[in-house]
Amino acid sequence: MSHNFKKSLGQNFLQDKNIIEKIVNFIPLENEDVLEIGPGQGALTNLLVKKSKNVLAYEIDKELIPFLKEKIKAKNFTLKHEDFLKSEIDFQDKKIIIANIPYFITSDILFKIFENHKFFTKALIMVQKEIADKLIAKANDSNYGKLSVSSQFFANIKKVINVPRTCFYPQPNVDSAVVYFEFKNDIENIDIEKFLVFIKTCFSQQRKKLSNNLKNVYDLEKIKSVLKKLNLSFEVRPQQIDLNVYKILFYELN
């Protein structure tokens, strides 16, 4: 297919058959409903419809819609010409997400998924390698930050497939990785929106002390008291605290 690749949509289509097979075979899909974000020219989709129970794909590029409809005529395939970020998520059956997403909207898509985590069980998502390293980073790692804490609140995460830039067309300027998410069923009874804002506040100036970031929102004496209660130094920095401690901090300060 001759296609006018759109930089505005961040189009880099996965071409490598070996990588495609690794993605599709990573988890059993025979009895699963799959949601694919950005099927592109359908290289991954074509195998997904053969391996899974049902595939629902969201494609924003109207030029690709007739091509995909012609290429993939499987009865278990549903194609939506729709922006996933603007779509309403309300499924009767939980789905597995499989996606090769544009780098420039990675965070937007991830947080759309996190906000609707109850509709999904697992996800395999292709991201820029640098983002993958941030997603899986633990406290005291140089890659550890608000994305690490926020993402790990919703899911257990690991990097499972390294994908060189040569596996795509057009070829991007960076390497990628597939990240595996297992969404947690036991997320605490917590105000998720408020917690995510709290984490953003904690990491607002990552190189500064945590207390310095928090004092813009909370009373300084209360911050000192809570840090002392948790046996944390007043000098502690955001990247030195793990997810479980952040959850306790949130409860104590609110």
Curated annotation (Swiss-Prot):
<keyword id="KW-0808">Transferase</keyword>
<feature type="binding site">
    <location>
        <position position="59"/>
    </location>
    <ligand>
        <name>S-adenosyl-L-methionine</name>
    </ligand>
</feature>
<feature type="binding site">
    <location>
        <position position="12"/>
    </location>
    <ligand>
        <name>S-adenosyl-L-methionine</name>
    </ligand>
</feature>
<dbReference type="GO" id="GO:0005829">
    <property type="term" value="C:cytosol"/>
</dbReference>
<dbReference type="InterPro" id="IPR020598">
    <property type="entry name" value="rRNA_Ade_methylase_Trfase_N"/>
</dbReference>
<comment type="similarity">
    <text>Belongs to the class I-like SAM-binding methyltransferase superfamily. rRNA adenine N(6)-methyltransferase family. RsmA subfamily.</text>
</comment>
<keyword id="KW-0489">Methyltransferase</keyword>
<dbReference type="GO" id="GO:0003723">
    <property type="term" value="F:RNA binding"/>
</dbReference>
<keyword id="KW-0694">RNA-binding</keyword>
<comment type="function">
    <text>Specifically dimethylates two adjacent adenosines (A1518 and A1519) in the loop of a conserved hairpin near the 3'-end of 16S rRNA in the 30S particle. May play a critical role in biogenesis of 30S subunits.</text>
</comment>
<keyword id="KW-0963">Cytoplasm</keyword>
<feature type="binding site">
    <location>
        <position position="100"/>
    </location>
    <ligand>
        <name>S-adenosyl-L-methionine</name>
    </ligand>
</feature>
<keyword id="KW-0698">rRNA processing</keyword>
<dbReference type="InterPro" id="IPR023165">
    <property type="entry name" value="rRNA_Ade_diMease-like_C"/>
</dbReference>
<dbReference type="InterPro" id="IPR029063">
    <property type="entry name" value="SAM-dependent_MTases_sf"/>
</dbReference>
<dbReference type="Pfam" id="PF00398">
    <property type="entry name" value="RrnaAD"/>
</dbReference>
<feature type="binding site">
    <location>
        <position position="83"/>
    </location>
    <ligand>
        <name>S-adenosyl-L-methionine</name>
    </ligand>
</feature>
<dbReference type="GO" id="GO:0052908">
    <property type="term" value="F:16S rRNA (adenine(1518)-N(6)/adenine(1519)-N(6))-dimethyltransferase activity"/>
</dbReference>
<protein>
    <recommendedName>
        <fullName>Ribosomal RNA small subunit methyltransferase A</fullName>
        <ecNumber>2.1.1.182</ecNumber>
    </recommendedName>
</protein>
<keyword id="KW-0949">S-adenosyl-L-methionine</keyword>
<dbReference type="InterPro" id="IPR020596">
    <property type="entry name" value="rRNA_Ade_Mease_Trfase_CS"/>
</dbReference>
<feature type="binding site">
    <location>
        <position position="38"/>
    </location>
    <ligand>
        <name>S-adenosyl-L-methionine</name>
    </ligand>
</feature>
<dbReference type="InterPro" id="IPR011530">
    <property type="entry name" value="rRNA_adenine_dimethylase"/>
</dbReference>
<dbReference type="InterPro" id="IPR001737">
    <property type="entry name" value="KsgA/Erm"/>
</dbReference>
<feature type="binding site">
    <location>
        <position position="14"/>
    </location>
    <ligand>
        <name>S-adenosyl-L-methionine</name>
    </ligand>
</feature>
